[in-house]
Every structure is written in structure tokens, then in C-alpha cells.
Amino acid sequence: MQKNNRVVVGMSGGVDSSVAAYLLKEQGYEVIGVTMQIWQDKDEEAVRVEGGCCSLAAVNDARRVANKIGIKYYVMNFKDVFKEKVIDYFVDEYLRGRTPNPCIACNKYIKFEELLKRAWMIDAYYVATGHYAIKEYDEERGRYLLKKSVDTSKDQTYVLYNLTQTQLEHILFPLGKYKKDKVRELAKNLGLPVASKPDSQEICFVTDNDYGKFIRENAKEEIKPGEFRDTRGRFLGYHKGIIHYTIGQRKGLGISVGKPLYVVDIDAENNVVVLGYGDEVYGDELISYNNNFISIDKLEKEMRVKAKIRYTAKEQDAVIRPLEDGRVFVKFDNPQRAITPGQSVVFYDGDIVVGGGIIERKVR
């Protein structure tokens, strides 16, 4: 495709994507706002009111913003591919005793793959979002880099580590060099109708934040109760189904042995949740798979990095080493709490995203 200044902005009806659309228009881009219709909850009222970027209210907010700033606006249907790539993945991972991050899957398969395809269909060279991240081209490396946002408290590079060089060429992140409070101030000064709208906190398609209920309603198999066992295999009691538990969990176990117990492992094959004491939740080695690298073409030798094992975690010193099958071995300098299969581990070199992958398992 020939390079042009037409950009499709993914508009969720929130303040960030709204300001992103405005900034791009001010920079001279031909901006087309698009809200992705991705999920229809069975509870129509919940979707209308609470459904985050999936709700009918979000569509109305995005349309009002588009009218206010004077850009074209469309709603596009992504329901089928979203169900396949995000919903089914989310449910299947929990059934396997793992804890997925659906936002990472949504970014990988929907926002920066499917939306980009739609953008190209209407001859738009770029796709933009309201993510807090910076894209730069490094002449020396001959690669696009993904770097942390100026607002480190809002940085979203953790959920963007899957981006490819081709995708990065066609992506714009207008908010990367803005602080969140400045974005809100800008929205307020512009009179945008979403200026005071709170940020969404929950997973957009689980409107009541009840993961267990959502998985039961969407699973193709029955959720069966099973056994709690300790790390030596001794029976401790019964659980209500592995979908209700995640590594490091303490609340809601219903088991008392005099000392606090935590979930330290989930054996989906045998429907067993393994409980242990506080020190047994920690580990310093893991293996990741489905790895993607951004600042380098591929990991060919041992490399010292900062790594984080969940969105809210702090970066920790670690060494990463390539394995023969494309997986990566990660060794932390210090033990990490609750290394959780299904979550992602992301590697940093200063403010540059090296890459990342999905945690397969804790080694020790």
C-alpha cells in the first residue's frame, strides 16, 4: 500500500481514544473513527450500561466525540473473530487451569490485526489507539522500537509486546508522550463529552466481574468439583472447580489448617488444586512460549533484562536464554511471587520493550 495520511482510530468511547483522535486530526491526518463491536452479553442492560468498550453507551459516546471534533465515524462488526480469538481462548485457558490476559489476545488478534486489515480495505495506511506507549524507528538497528510511555504509571507496553515490525510500521500512539492528567485536561478544555468518564477497570466482556459465571455460561464442558491437595499429595478437601482459582490465591479456599494456605499449582488433568504455605508460592525460574521480540529479530544468546510477570508487577532483574524449540528460559535474580501459567512475561531493556511470551510453567 502506498503511504498516506489516512488513519483509522479505534474509539472505545473513553477519554484516551477520543483525545488520540483529536490530536491526530490536529496533526493533519485524515481521521476515521471506528468502534469495534466485539461482544454481546446475554444481559442487554449490562451491556448498555456497564460493558466498557463493548457497550452501546460506548458507541454513543464515541459517536458524540466524532461529531464534536468533526471526523467520520463507523461501527464495525468483529464479533465472530473476537469470540474465536479472545472469548474461546479465555474460557479454554481457565479450563486448562491457567490464568489468561484477554487484553493481550485482543490487542494481538483484534486491534492490531483485524482492525488493521479493515483499515487497509478503506485505504488507510495507519491504525491508531489511545494506548500509552511510544513507537520509534531506530536507524541503527533498522527496526521499529516499542518504548514506555512518558507517563510510567499508565504505561501499557506490557499488553503490546506481541506487535510485529509490519504492524508497528502502520501503528500510531498519539498519547505516548502525554501524562494522563494532561489528556483529561485537554479533553475538558475541548469540551469533549467524555472528559470526566472514568477509566474502565474490569475485563470488558465480563460485565459483572464474575469470571466463574462467565466461563460456566460459555464453556463447552461441565465444570466439575475436585480435590484440594497439599504439595505432598495429601487430601485437604474439595474445591468447586479449577476455573475459580489462580496461583497465589488465598481468599475463598474454605480450607483451614492453622496457617494461611495459598494456591501453588493447578493440575487440570487430574482436576486437583494444590495448596501450600506462603514460601511455596515463590519461584525464580520459568519457561515462556509463543515469544515475540521487537527490539531484536530473535533471541540468540543469553541476555540480561528487566522482566515483569503480570501487568501490575514491578520489573525485576532477570536473565533470559533461548531454548531450542523457540521457548525462553527466564531466571530471576530474586524469587517472584505467584508465577502464573497463562499470564505473560515481558522483557525490557531500560524503556525499550525487548519482547515477551506466555508463561508455560514455573520451573522452580
Swiss-Prot record:
Site (Interaction with tRNA): H131, Q343
Disulphide bridges: C106-C204
CDD domains: MnmA_TRMU-like
GO biological process, one term: tRNA wobble position uridine thiolation
Region (Interaction with tRNA): 154-156, 310-311
Active site: residue positions: C106, C204
Keywords on record: ATP-binding, Cytoplasm, Disulfide bond, Nucleotide-binding, RNA-binding, Transferase, tRNA processing, tRNA-binding
Annotated compartments: Cytoplasm
Gene3D superfamilies: Adenine nucleotide alpha hydrolases-like domains, HUPs, Translation factors
GO molecular function ontology, one term from the record: tRNA-uridine 2-sulfurtransferase activity
Enzyme class name: transferase
GO cellular component, one term: cytoplasm
Coiled-coil stretches: none
Main subcellular localisation: cytoplasm
Binding of ATP, residues: G10, M11, S12, G13, G14, V15, D16, S17, M36, G130
Signal peptide: none
UniProt-listed Pfam families: tRNA_Me_trans, tRNA_Me_trans_C, tRNA_Me_trans_M
InterPro entries given in the database record: MnmA-like, MnmA-like_C, MnmA-like_central, MnmA-like_central_sf, Rhodanese-like_dom, Rossmann-like_a/b/a_fold
E.C. code: 2.8.1.13
Catalytic reaction equation(s): S-sulfanyl-L-cysteinyl-[protein] + uridine(34) in tRNA + AH2 + ATP = 2-thiouridine(34) in tRNA + L-cysteinyl-[protein] + A + AMP + diphosphate + H(+)
Family: Belongs to the MnmA/TRMU family.
Function: Catalyzes the 2-thiolation of uridine at the wobble position (U34) of tRNA, leading to the formation of s(2)U34.
PANTHER family the UniProt entry points to: MITOCHONDRIAL TRNA-SPECIFIC 2-THIOURIDYLASE 1, TRNA 5-METHYLAMINOMETHYL-2-THIOURIDYLATE -METHYLTRANSFERASE
HAMAP family given in the database record: tRNA_thiouridyl_MnmA
This protein's name: tRNA-specific 2-thiouridylase MnmA 2
UniProt source species: Caldanaerobacter subterraneus subsp. tengcongensis (strain DSM 15242 / JCM 11007 / NBRC 100824 / MB4) (Thermoanaerobacter tengcongensis)
Taxonomic lineage of the native organism: Bacteria, Bacillati, Bacillota, Clostridia, Thermoanaerobacterales
